[in-house]
From Swiss-Prot:
A motif (Nudix box) lies at residues 164-185. This is NAD-capped RNA hydrolase NudC. mRNA decapping enzyme that specifically removes the nicotinamide adenine dinucleotide (NAD) cap from a subset of mRNAs by hydrolyzing the diphosphate linkage to produce nicotinamide mononucleotide (NMN) and 5' monophosphate mRNA. The NAD-cap is present at the 5'-end of some mRNAs and stabilizes RNA against 5'-processing. Has preference for mRNAs with a 5'-end purine. Catalyzes the hydrolysis of a broad range of dinucleotide pyrophosphates. The keyword Calcium does not apply. Divalent metal cations. Mg(2+) or Mn(2+). Binds 1 zinc ion per subunit. Residues 130-253 form the Nudix hydrolase domain. It comes from the Bacteria. GO terms for cellular component: cytosol. Keywords: Hydrolase, Magnesium, Manganese, Metal-binding, NAD, Zinc. Belongs to the Nudix hydrolase family. NudC subfamily. Its EC number is 3.6.1.-, 3.6.1.22. InterPro entries: NAD-cap_RNA_hydrolase_NudC, NudC-like_C, Nudix_hydrolase, NUDIX_hydrolase-like_dom_sf, NUDIX_hydrolase_CS, NUDIX_hydrolase_dom, RNA_Hydrolase_NudC, Znr_NADH_PPase. It comes from Vibrio atlanticus (strain LGP32) (Vibrio splendidus (strain Mel32)).
């Protein structure tokens, strides 16, 4: 539930002012203080939770009269998870209010319903909840190697694991197998859940898996990828940044391979 506060002008609180995928930060942390001290107008400020025992307020930058120094959410991947998730939440709420201004049922004007985390039509009263796009992301292992791919959108040339959107009528496990097959031509088995991460670019939920190579020849789909290779864990390329669940998958797989290698060496001796 979103909460309005009668004390927004004087509350000592953290503030999340967002614009698209950008957020206001001060000295690499959430700005802290009262709205009065920070020069913020609070008519549209909404409490979206707590951080370190203090309220967190969200505002869209269009509701702020002063110019603020904004940074991309991607630049905050080094933040502690609790802080990054709060920033992600604010950005996703901002995206909801900006992308769902009109009701798809009747065309009426939507407004934010503070009792439901949703936009509500002023005419037909239909509630429209935030759009969350489910995606899978998977690290595939083949003995002592990991499958990594390079995407044209990654200008730095980094490599990462395979990912894709869930289709209608599809289980997560089916999606894992399909995406790997479509993008690389290989089959996988032993698909197992690893973890998840909200990914506010603009509103995805990444559901992470581990899988094992089961067969097929690596044939990258060059309409989707720039490259895909099996990499030995001793010679990895530049990979996804720290803070991403892609990096967690890669590190977990590399650790498992190294542990297995050590165990094999101990058995030989």
């Amino acid at each position: 539930m979103l909460k309005k506060s009668d004390n927004k002008m004087t509350d000592q609180a953290y503030w999340c002012v967002v614009s698209g995928s950008d957020i206001w930060v001060n000295d690499d942390q959430f700005p802290f203080g009262s709205a009065e001290e920070l020069g913020l107008s609070v008519e549209h400020a909404i409490c979206i939770g707590q951080h370190q025992g203090r309220k967190v307020y969200w505002l869209n930058d269009c509701d702020v009269e002063i110019e603020l120094s904004m940074v991309s959410l991607r630049d905050l991947l080094h933040w502690p998870e609790s802080s990054f998730l709060i920033a992600s939440k604010a950005i996703q709420y901002g995206h909801m209010t900006q992308s769902m201004r009109f009701c798809p049922q009747c065309g009426g004007r939507n407004h934010l319903n503070h009792n439901q985390v949703a936009m509500q039509c002023g005419d037909c009263r239909t509630l429209h909840y935030p759009r969350i796009f489910p995606c899978i992301i998977v690290a595939v292992r083949n003995d002592n190697k990991i499958l990594l791919a390079q995407h044209p959108r990654h200008k730095t040339g980094m490599y990462t694991v395979i990912a894709g959107f869930l289709e209608v009528g599809e289980t997560l496990e089916q999606c894992v197998a399909r995406e790997v097959k479509e993008e690389t031509g290989i089959d996988v088995s032993n698909i197992r859940y690893f973890g998840s991460q909200p990914w506010a670019f603009p509103s995805s939920m990444m559901m992470a898996f581990l899988a094992d190579y089961a067969g097929g020849t690596l044939k990258p789909d060059y309409s989707e990828l720039s490259d895909a290779q099996w990499f030995d864990v001793t010679s990895l390329p530049d990979v996804a940044p720290v803070g991403t669940i892609a990096r967690q998958l890669i590190e977990n797989t590399v650790d498992d391979i190294r542990k297995a290698s050590v165990a094999e060496q101990e058995l030989e001796h």
